[in-house]
């Protein structure tokens, strides 16, 4: 084994195995995307005058209780439009049974009693740990009601989309910030807009503790024919410093209000987009980016991947190609160490349900937010039988249950496999594995010096196998589990497995 040029300081932090950072050499192994362990429809009461407007939703863990923000529209409307969408709120203690928040601030669709918190708003609420402007709750999204005058003052003088009188281009658009002390009563941030562009999907903003800046993930526009929707990224040092930092392009059409049409790559770099490995007409958007707070250097995104039917002819087998801007969507998984460079793994994370089921089979969008309860992570997504561009059937919200750290694993089959890490420097006296060996699998860990020489007492021959299934299994050798004598010096791990899935490792103090 050649001398290493880099030693990874892992301390006592948990390290996830979703890329090759900790796999310097290997044989007989593969990385695997693991879909949710369980998918359960939620029980969400409905109001007679409203129906789902789109698939966009967000779940927040607020003081141990779950808050679900989702979007509805008046039932009599034929097709969803962001200007007739309403952001609504529900609460739950168990994540399955929900109650509508008794907001009762606006009369909508003839309903005086309802859970609408923001009429004409489409976007993503988030919790700001910095409590900018003294507010814990913030929201990023589009604003603009159809009703005149708007029933909500905060939607006045906003632009979701309009048409320029000179050339007919749709250029009046912006993305806005709002804030709230209680998550129910919202006020618009008046110091500016996030971006003066039309990003009419579920956009995101959150504080990145690693960089000390606020990060926005926005819908971008690709110049590549057939690949229109992308994910763009911008930053700002503060929520009050608007717009987010982007280079101006004076050649872009501009409305009298100083607003533009789509967000192009010269103004905001793409971090996710369709490419040559996708079908020619494929969009990637609504990224649902989640910094993973239970491990080091891990960000998971769950973009919707949309394959367009345009230009197809199914010869009357079905309706493919008969309508513009139509086609199916699935949720894929993208992984990142820094929130900038993403590796989109092409296996569906939440795929389409059976077409024969009345509520499934057309489109799936993941909601924003990860919630941990014990050894499991919970997410929420919306699925419907309708494909994009067809809105004759409603969407339904589901809960997805995932194992802690379980999104990606390094897997060995029954013939076995192994990998060796680069040199790492740890703290603590115990080594823990999040691993599933089932009933027939096992794993062994050998610790080596920086050059790859097995360390006495920690060789493969000394190793006691780890078996069965656990999120924090202690590694032992014949002399016991104590790795404290090696703390603070460069070592390598050689992990040998068969019939096993390894998700993460972590050094810790003795238990």
Enumerate the language-model features and the residues they cover.
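Beta-rich carbohydrate-recognition and catalytic domains
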Residues: 1-203, 207-286, 291-361, 374-376, ...
